[in-house]
From Swiss-Prot:
One of its GO terms (biological process) is regulation of programmed cell death. Undergoes progressive proteolysis to an 11 kDa C-terminal fragment, which is blocked by the proteasome inhibitor lactacystin. The keyword Iron-sulfur does not apply. The gene is BNIP3L. Residues 69-80 have a biased composition (Basic and acidic residues). Disulfide bonds: none annotated. The keyword Transferase does not apply. This is BCL2/adenovirus E1B 19 kDa protein-interacting protein 3-like. The lineage of its organism: Eukaryota, Metazoa, Chordata, Craniata, Vertebrata. It is found in: Nucleus envelope; Endoplasmic reticulum; Mitochondrion outer membrane; Membrane. A motif (BH3) lies at residues 126-148. The modification Phosphoserine is found at S62, S117, S118, S120, S166.
Amino acid sequence: MSSHLVEQPPPPHNNNNNCEEGEQSLPPPAGLNSSWVELPMNSSNGNDNGNGKNGGLEHVPSSSSIHNGDMEKILLDAQHESGQSSSRGSSHCDSPSPQEDGQIMFDVEMHTSKDHSSQSEEEVAEGEKEVDALKKSVDWVSDWSSRPENIPPKEFHFRHPKRSVSLSMRKSGAMKKGGIFSAEFLKVFIPSLFLSHVLALGLGIYIGKRLSTPSASTY
């Protein structure tokens, strides 16, 4: 049986500079940092008889070999856990913190609530406009049905009452120009009337004298 001295490497440390607040690496087991462990190695004769001849006794694993096997398992487990912790730390640094998640969710909720409030205000304004339009239409119909017929007002002209005209020959139709009693007609009618009377009177006197003379001559 030959022994070899093997230097056990120190367990890997997680040096993650990006995550200062991440999980710290596990401390190495005590007594393994730069320690030398004696590993018993069997001679490669190929059969058990050679081992029995060389050693003379059956090989019994020593406490150091058992301790070395346990340490190897512990080192492998520690390396595996350190890898998992490093991956968790990187994912922890990459993923947002719960506070940031809550802040993002709160911002999203505030944005959605603002959108809903703006939409609700717009809907209320539109509803009020529709109600006002309906009221105006109803008022217009009521006014149109209650008012009188659409007839333009008449223009009123104030006229003074006619005065009673006094009777006079001057303003009559006969006294007007071309009438019976007009000035031109009277200027012609009166002289002709006078001459006709004079002629009739002279003719009557003459006829009377003629009749009286024969009767006187007969006596």
